């Protein structure tokens, strides 16, 4: 889960097997048990961590194993078996053990760093300056640092022509 730093009512959540989706919620529009998310990003991959960029409207996700819904045999289909009853198989996809950056609010994937680690990226954190992501893979016994976002452009205040003069 991750709260959005520049739009305080946005909460991103990620799910694992068998759902494998990122959901973005607005706490100002949640009403009761049957609330729907503002956006859903289907990945068919375990979403292990999420981070909003403090500098731009982007959401970073780290992933683990990917999976595919396998339809039941033909004999089962005649009995109206739903997708929920279908088997799930672990597969290798570009999102397996990856880092992905998604644009908000379009939810378009801007970047995928495939195979960021050789196994599941189990945890990550954002650096204090909001530019780097640190990822952990216990199976590799490795911590990696990734520069994801650049330093924000400083708009800087121009000095007023009257700044050097005081009334008192």
Where are these regions (language model features)?
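Terminal intrinsically disordered, low-complexity extensions flanking WD-repeat/beta-propeller proteins
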Residues: 33-37, 44-48, 53-58, 63-168
């Amino acid at each position: 889960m991750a709260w959005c730093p520049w739009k305080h009512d946005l909460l991103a959540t990620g799910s694992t097997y068998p759902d494998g989706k990122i959901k973005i919620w607005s706490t100002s529009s949640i009403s009761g048990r049957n609330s729907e998310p503002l956006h859903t990003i289907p990945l068919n991959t375990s979403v292990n961590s999420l981070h909003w960029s403090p500098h731009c409207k982007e959401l970073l996700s780290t992933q683990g194993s990917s999976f595919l819904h396998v339809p039941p045999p033909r004999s089962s289909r005649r009995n109206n078996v739903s997708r929920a009853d279908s088997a799930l198989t672990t597969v290798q996809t570009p999102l397996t053990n990856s880092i992905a950056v998604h644009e908000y609010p379009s939810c378009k994937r801007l970047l995928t760093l495939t195979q960021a680690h050789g196994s599941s990226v189990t945890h990550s954190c954002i650096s204090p300056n909001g530019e780097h992501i640190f990822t952990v893979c216990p199976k590799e016994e490795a911590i990696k640092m990734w520069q994801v976002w650049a330093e924000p452009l400083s708009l800087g205040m121009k000095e007023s022509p009257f700044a050097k003069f005081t009334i008192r």
